[in-house]
Amino acid sequence: MDVVAKLDEKKMTTPDEGGWSPRDNLAHLTEWMNSMMGYHMDKRPPHEVMRISEEATRGWDMEVINPELFERNKDRSTQDVLDELKRTYETVLAKLESTPFEDLMKPRHAHDPEKRPLLMWVIGDTSGHFEEHRQVIERML
């Protein structure tokens, strides 16, 4: 959040060349944290968790999913996005603290030949994803 603290309201809502503002990036991260908890940790159907069509989640096509998430969030206020981001992050932390480490190390998908652990998906939708979008936001400074 250090990089976000450097942004005033104008910078928070100014889109980059791809059309996303820092606020849009933060709303996107919140969507994916919620998705990670609902789909990966709670094992609910992805389309229900993400509130998008089942067809969109079937192939995990980010060129379909991410624009839908963007459209849903683009008109939200900066404060609303920041408040939800904070609440969601706190929920992620609480959920991880209450999950036994052994469960995080179990394969997420029974059909995965690589037997990748749940923890890999958690990292991908949290710290790995945060880093990616932090870099995007920093380029806008």
Regions of interest found by a model, annotated:
Residues 15-64, 104-141:
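Short, contiguous alpha-helical
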Residues 1-5, 33-41, 86-100, 131-134, ...:
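Structural signal for well-ordered, non-membrane alpha-helices
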Residues 14-15, 70, 81, 122:
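Generic anion/oxyanion-binding catalytic loop in active/binding sites
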Residues 8, 86, 115-116:
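Short hydrophobic/aromatic segments of transmembrane alpha-helices and their interfaces
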Residues 1-21:
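Long, hydrophobic N-terminal alpha-helical segment
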Residues 58-104:
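Acidic/histidine-rich alpha-helical segments that form the ligand environment
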